[in-house]
């Protein structure tokens, strides 16, 4: 029997109702005469505390609260890709058609078009035994996504019967029935799954394959693996959103889930405007054909921010179970934590550090632990991954505040954005001294097998130059660069070249916005070759001024924008020209 109670107290998005003894934790309820969507978050006797996912203006004590008997769930099936949802998977385009620019309260519609037909190709036969997670057929969802129709994870299994033949069917069509353990279950193209419950899998693997983003400072210096976790904290104006947009655009994953959680609406609009016109570099198809957007902007109800994170990660796990690599980008987890803080305050809970609830760390852990590279449940065997990347917006760029410090406990890649770099127009403004990646050793083998076996040693050499430059900064600040010998002045010069020619990247330049792994390796090798040849030339008595005057330096610094990904021979020619120029200024051939 569904719980039925009455509102006794309203405080912003928090509502208290009595007569709810039949309710369960995290059960979805309808609140008030307007039937607003809410979720039970605490039970004390027959009193339920409910967070409401819509505006509670006008709610008053005495209005009914009715339980649905189900937890907050999302609909999973064909038609999700390319959609724009709010935090509880309501399609915003459909809602805008129904109610105009401002969404009315209590309006609901199906998350996908249930009447749209897809061409279903069965992969099982009548009489076959199936279990939870088995693929029974496929449909083509978009030009980029072949969508596997799977037996729901909570299915008990059984024999297939009444299987439809290949053809066009809508989502409500019963594709097959299963018979087992005395019950008959209908299988359709879609099923529902609770957002707070991770989807099951067979095995979990170590993340050993890099997620290539086309951003040099990430891929080369602080890489993230498929199935890994990363965080990008930074103060206001340091470029978090643009960096996350770049990852969402160019990451070599099959599906991208972009969650705008409590940020400006214009940032979601930018994604909606740009992505349909941008082409996937691997397939040439529009990027929206692989993207799902969950928009929960700063002026939307605060309670739905928490739900938006869980909605997004559940959709990501669904596509992971098809054997796809999924990237989930959350911008920003700080706004999500602020929503937790507001709800905690409304519920009069004891605050912890900076007013955040004491369970902030466990909620962050729940989210980041849903990342991973796994073998999906059922058959045939499918390997997929969910990579979680969360932005953090610490007030004033203070990385010691609770959200940043707790996040650092649960992630392995940390891209620290630096306001000084951003204000000096160095983008992406990832500080190479404060950032780190725990996946470097795991993915070095992939780079060695697929790009070049000396990738790790070159990366160490370039990073060593940046570290040595950092130690020399203090001397230069006190005594000036002229106090240094030529060998150390060369380090400063090469570090400058690394920053401009390798670390900096222009997201608005057609060539430089995406950099292939081969080009990243060649640019890094050019800089290391220049450094080694410069060292040898100085040992042989060549003045540093002659090295600084080389024309090859300008060409090398502009190569990131002048040389396209399919023009690698140009970089080989640049290396040869640099070799000749060193020969001319030293008078002897400098060995590699």
From Swiss-Prot:
Membrane topology qualifier: Peripheral membrane protein
Any one cellular-component term (Gene Ontology): plasma membrane
| Primary site of residence | membrane
Q: Which GO terms describe its biological process?
A: proton motive force-driven plasma membrane ATP synthesis; proton transmembrane transport
Which domain of life does the protein's organism represent? Answer: Archaea
Q: Which Gene3D superfamilies match?
A: 2.40.30.20, 2.40.50.100, Bovine Mitochondrial F1-atpase, Atp Synthase Beta Chain, Chain D, domain 3 (1.10.1140.10), P-loop containing nucleotide triphosphate hydrolases (3.40.50.300)
In terms of Pfam families, this protein maps to: ATP-synt_ab, ATP-synt_ab_N, ATP-synt_ab_Xtn, ATP-synt_VA_C
Q: Which GO terms describe its molecular function?
A: ATP binding; ATP hydrolysis activity; proton-transporting ATP synthase activity, rotational mechanism; proton-transporting ATPase activity, rotational mechanism
Positions annotated to bind ATP = 234-241
Record's keyword annotation contains Nucleus: no
Q: Which InterPro entries match?
A: AAA+_ATPase, ATP-synt_VA_C, ATP-synth_a_Xtn, ATP_synth_asu-like_sf, ATPase_a/bsu_AS, ATPase_F1/V1/A1_a/bsu_N, ATPase_F1/V1/A1_a/bsu_N_sf, ATPase_F1/V1/A1_a/bsu_nucl-bd
Output the NCBIfam families linked to this UniProt entry: PRK04192.1
Q: Can you state the subunit structure given in the record?
A: Has multiple subunits with at least A(3), B(3), C, D, E, F, H, I and proteolipid K(x).
Q: Which family does it belong to?
A: Belongs to the ATPase alpha/beta chains family.
Q: What is this protein called?
A: A-type ATP synthase subunit A
Gene source species: Nitrosopumilus maritimus (strain SCM1)
The encoding gene is atpA
């Amino acid at each position: 029997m569904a719980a039925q109670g009455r509102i006794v107290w309203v405080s912003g998005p928090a509502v208290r109702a009595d007569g709810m003894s039949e309710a369960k934790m995290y059960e979805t309820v309808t609140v008030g005469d307007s039937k607003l969507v809410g979720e039970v978050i605490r039970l004390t006797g027959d009193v339920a505390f409910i967070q409401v996912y819509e505006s509670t203006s006008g709610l008053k004590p005495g209005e009914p609260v009715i339980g649905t008997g189900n937890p907050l769930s999302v609909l999973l099936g064909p038609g999700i890709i390319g959609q724009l949802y709010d935090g509880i998977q309501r399609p915003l385009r459909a809602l805008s058609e129904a109610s105009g620019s401002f969404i009315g309260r209590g309006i609901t519609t199906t998350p996908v078009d249930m009447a749209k037909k897809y061409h279903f190709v069965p992969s099982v036969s009548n009489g076959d035994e199936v279990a939870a997670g088995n693929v029974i057929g496929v449909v083509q969802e978009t030009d980029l996504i072949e969508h596997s129709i799977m037996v729901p994870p909570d299915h008990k299994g059984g024999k297939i019967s009444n299987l439809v033949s290949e053809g066009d069917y809508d989502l409500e069509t019963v594709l097959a029935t299963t018979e087992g353990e005395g019950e008959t279950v209908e299988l359709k193209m879609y099923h529902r799954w609770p957002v707070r419950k991770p989807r099951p899998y067979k095995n979990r693997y170590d993340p050993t394959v890099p997620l290539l983003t086309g951003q040099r400072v990430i891929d080369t210096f602080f890489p993230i693996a498929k199935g890994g976790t990363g965080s990008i904290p930074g103060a206001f104006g340091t470029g978090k959103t643009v960096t996350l947009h770049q990852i969402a655009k160019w990451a070599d994953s099959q599906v991208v889930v972009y969650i705008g959680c409590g940020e400006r609406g214009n940032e979601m609009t930018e994604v909606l405007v740009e992505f349909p016109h941008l082409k996937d570099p691997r397939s040439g198809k529009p990027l929206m054909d692989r993207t799902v957007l969950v928009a929960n902007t700063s002026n939307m109800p605060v309670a739905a921010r928490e739900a938006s994170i869980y909605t997004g990660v559940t959709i990501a796990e669904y596509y992971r179970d098809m054997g796809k690599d999924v990237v989930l980008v959350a911008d920003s987890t700080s706004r999500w934590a602020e929503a937790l803080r507001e709800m905690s305050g409304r519920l009069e809970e004891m605050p912890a550090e900076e007013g955040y609830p004491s369970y902030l760390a466990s909620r962050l852990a729940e989210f980041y632990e849903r990342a991973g590279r796994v073998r999906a449940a059922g058959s045939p065997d499918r390997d997929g991954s969910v990579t979680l990347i969360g932005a953090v917006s610490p007030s004033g760029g203070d990385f010691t505040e609770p959200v940043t410090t707790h996040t650092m406990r649960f992630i392995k890649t940390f891209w620290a954005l630096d306001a000084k770099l951003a204000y000096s127009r160095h983008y992406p403004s990832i500080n190479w001294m404060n950032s780190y990646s725990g996946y470097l050793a795991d993915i070095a083998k992939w780079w060695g097998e697929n790009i070049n076996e000396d990738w790790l040693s070159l990366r160490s050499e370039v990073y060593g130059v940046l570290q040595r430059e950092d130690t020399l900064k203090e001397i230069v600040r006190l005594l000036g660069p002229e106090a240094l010998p030529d060998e150390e002045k060369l380090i400063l010069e090469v570090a400058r070249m690394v920053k401009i020619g390798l670390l900096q990247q222009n997201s608005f330049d057609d060539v430089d916005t995406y950099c292939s792994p081969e080009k990243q390796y060649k640019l890094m090798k050019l800089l290391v070759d220049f450094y080694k040849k410069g060292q040898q030339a100085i040992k042989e008595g060549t003045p540093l001024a002659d090295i600084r005057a080389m024309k090859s330096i300008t060409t090398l610094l502009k190569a990131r924008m002048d040389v396209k990904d399919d023009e690698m021979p140009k970089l080989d020619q640049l290396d040869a020209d640099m070799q000749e120029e060193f020969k001319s200024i030293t008078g002897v051939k400098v060995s590699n």
